[in-house]
């Protein structure tokens, strides 16, 4: 199975998450490709069995680079996806990601969110247990 992972990360939390996830998927003999929103072309994504999108919530919304990337996706009709959202609030933004991708007629497989604690700018604010939560998520893909 081939996974293409598209992410955006300001302080490193989403980068840490997608790198960990890619290793877990490789343990299942999967092929993975990781791209930032700056590296990927939303009009011509590499072929994949499943696309995984990972980004933070910022200013009570989905991070703007990922939001714009999702709006610009082309030729995604019927493609499968999973979503990951990091956030410092009590409410995640998975539903905003879902709404954007449903407009592209994509099919959701799974979603997971990770609340971050204080000291966000350190890049080490993922709360204890994030790896176990991500292991469970990977098992559903």
Describe each region flagged by the PLM.
Residues 37-40:
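Conserved SAM/SAH-binding loop
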Residues 2-24:
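N-terminal beta1-alpha1 ligand-phosphate binding loop
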Residues 16, 24, 28, 33, ...:
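FMN-binding flavodoxin-like domain, especially the glycine-rich phosphate-binding loop
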């Amino acid at each position: 199975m081939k996974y293409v992972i598209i992410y955006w990360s300001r302080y490193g939390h989403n980068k840490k998450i997608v790198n960990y996830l890619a290793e877990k998927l490789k343990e299942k003999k999967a092929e993975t490709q990781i791209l930032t929103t700056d590296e990927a072309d939303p009009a011509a994504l590499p072929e994949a069995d499943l696309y995984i999108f990972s980004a933070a919530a910022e200013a009570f919304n989905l991070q703007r680079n990922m939001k714009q990337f999702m709006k610009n996706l082309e030729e995604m009709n019927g493609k499968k996806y999973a979503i990951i959202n990091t956030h410092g609030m009590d409410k995640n933004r998975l539903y905003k990601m879902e709404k954007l991708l449903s407009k592209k007629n994509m099919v959701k497989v799974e979603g997971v969110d990770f609340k971050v604690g204080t000291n966000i700018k350190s890049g080490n604010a993922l709360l204890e247990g994030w790896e176990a939560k991500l292991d469970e998520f990977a098992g559903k893909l």
